[in-house]
Amino acid sequence: MTKNHTFRLRWTYIALSAVAGAASASDAVVAQLMTRDLIGMPGKEVTMETVEYAPGGKSPPHRHHAQVFVYVLEGSVRMQVQGSPAVTLSPGGTFYESPDDLHVVSENASQTKPAKFLVVMVKDKAKGAGGQPDESARDRARAP
């Protein structure tokens, strides 16, 4: 992993943690596993990471601007993109987000057990690390 990539990941994590801290009781723990350029597809890359939520943990509404593939490893997670119903996934369950989707719900479905899932993203390198919080969606999600 390059110093620039590590810096971008650290900055993104700090920004997400600040927003998530205001919106949830606990933060997601993200572990970057791999980033590779896609051969024959200039400007495209794939990233692989794990996300862990403590019991009751969640993330604020956000966008990845990537094709996102989720595979649940442990526990139970609830996912929803704007305009679709929420789904609850157990180990082996999968979820997909398109580059245009607003991810409005990403949370541990349990208040007593941790959850962990694998995320694979295919994206334009120019779009950055992804996961940018969407302030207007967060405000709408909190409205009565």
Which residues make up each language-model segment?
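Histidine-centered metal-chelating micro-motifs
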Residues: 58-60, 78, 95-108
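Glycine- and acidic-residue-biased ligand/ion/polar-headgroup-sensing regions
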Residues: 66-84, 91-93
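Extracytoplasmic
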Residues: 43-48, 67, 84, 100, ...
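N-terminal targeting signals for Sec/Tat export/insertion, comprising classic cleavable signal peptides
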Residues: 34-66, 109
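Sec/Tat-exported extracytoplasmic proteins
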Residues: 50, 57, 73-76, 81, ...
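Ligand-binding loop in jelly-roll beta-barrel domains
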Residues: 86, 100-127
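A short, N-terminal "cap"/entry segment at the start of jelly-roll beta-barrel domains
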Residues: 2-47, 80, 95-96, 114, ...
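Short acidic-glycine-tyrosine-enriched beta hairpin
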Residues: 38, 42, 53, 83-100
